Amino acid sequence: MFMIYPLLIISNIINFSKSDKLIFAGIHFRHGARGPIKLGRNGQDLLGVNWTSTGELTPLGQKMHYLLGLRNRQRYIKEYKLLSEEFDPHELVVYSSDINRTLLSVTSHIQGLYPINPNKEDVLNPDKLDEAVPPINITFDDISEAINTLNISALPNSMTIIPVHFIDFSIDNSVECTEKIENLRNRNDRKKESIINFEKGFKANYSEVLKKFYQNKIEIDLNFTMITHICDATVADHIERRNMTEFFKETNINQEDFINTCYEALKINFRDKLFSDDNNELLLFHISYIIEKIVHYMKQRINDDIKEDISSTNFSDYSSPKMLILSGHDTTLTAQELFFIKFFNYELESYIFPTFASQTAFEIARKEVDDNSRKNLKYSDYTLCHYFNDKLVFNMTFDTFLEKIGKINLWNSDNINKFCYGEKPILTTNLIIIISMGVLALILIIIVIILIFKIKNQKDEYLISEHHPSTDDKCCSSEEDE
């Protein structure tokens, strides 16, 4: 059995009790199992295993998130009654990065959170079924059969569909920013002792056999970046139980040791390279927007909970979501957890590489109070618990959390522009439009002024010619008189 690194708990504070009222849950998870990021032209990864595409979610990855969705249904719908049994758009908001594997993961997750229910009552009016068709010709056999099968159901087996919004986890994908980030990360490679030592150890154990394996296949420079690519393929193959016999037979490498070494390589890569610059610029660049969004939804929910009239049936006044779901990557989960480790002063060794379908949660609860007392609640009456894969990372009152966050200079667009482009002013689309309109207006003003001067000059010349005839005119007239 291969070791999957467990989270080291960085707090042993007891969770809130089940008698408390859970009012909010913010979920941020990594996508499920995927194919390797690097594939050769022949469709093989760096271990010689065949794949059909790079980095796409696999059926195993879909199942991971379906089961995680079922687990979250048990906790947040059945156990804590945070969400309704059926999807309510006022209760849940879902975001994903604009990447296939995160979108498919969150779609699979939702099917577990709100499973297919053949016995669910639909809202279609039987008298209106003739109108429940698109305005084009659909009179062929397959569709006719589907119409009869659906009857008063909107979708087969009353499956639930939920809107998913895009969130730009990377914030800025410009060439200048990408180059700046890569240069900063490469400088970290050269100075981080953990990276240097790991690379030396890896080469000592595996360099010769790997070079022999790759001989006449690809040219390989066994630096730390290449090591992480090899390990990415190893982890993907291992999770999927792909046939790696050829690789381990040819190299004579101990499979269990190599897989554990690869998990360690990925951990060091994320912890000590991707977000480890001295000024935390890479960390703040990637995570500020996500932290602000999570905090925004938490504050909004608490504020509405304080003023909420539970007897009201008007959702327009109290429509802040009770749950936020973010479908992200190992980079986004790592950035989030390193943010708390560094700025909340926890031990760096508590970081753990987030494996496929890892989940973090922000849960807010309070003591049960009667309706009259609720309006007197304060942020200090709400407890925030943060978990990584069900292990408690920290808990504190919400006012303490906001105080800690308030001391951190989260980045805005100005910080990002300065980081990417230096002190040079950045011409955004709106600014370019404004400047262009200003230039056009100035040109029009100049043209109008020139026209006014021309008209005035022509008028003056006309008046002069009327009152003071030219000498030539006088001569001509005299000659004619003679």
Go through the PLM ranges and name each one.
Residues 13-16, 431, 457-458, 475:
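N-terminal cationic leader/targeting segments used for protein routing and processing
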Residues 8-21:
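N-terminal signal peptide
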Residues 459-482:
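Cytosolic C-terminal tails of single-pass type I membrane
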Residues 8-11, 228, 233, 456:
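Short linear motifs centered on Gly/Pro in flexible linkers and helix caps
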Residues 15, 34, 332, 433, ...:
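Intrinsic structural disorder/low-complexity segments
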Residues 445-463:
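Transmembrane-helix exit/juxtamembrane "anchor" motif
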Residues 1-9:
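Sec-dependent signal peptide recognition
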Residues 20-93, 97-324, 328-451:
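Signature for phosphate-centric chemistry
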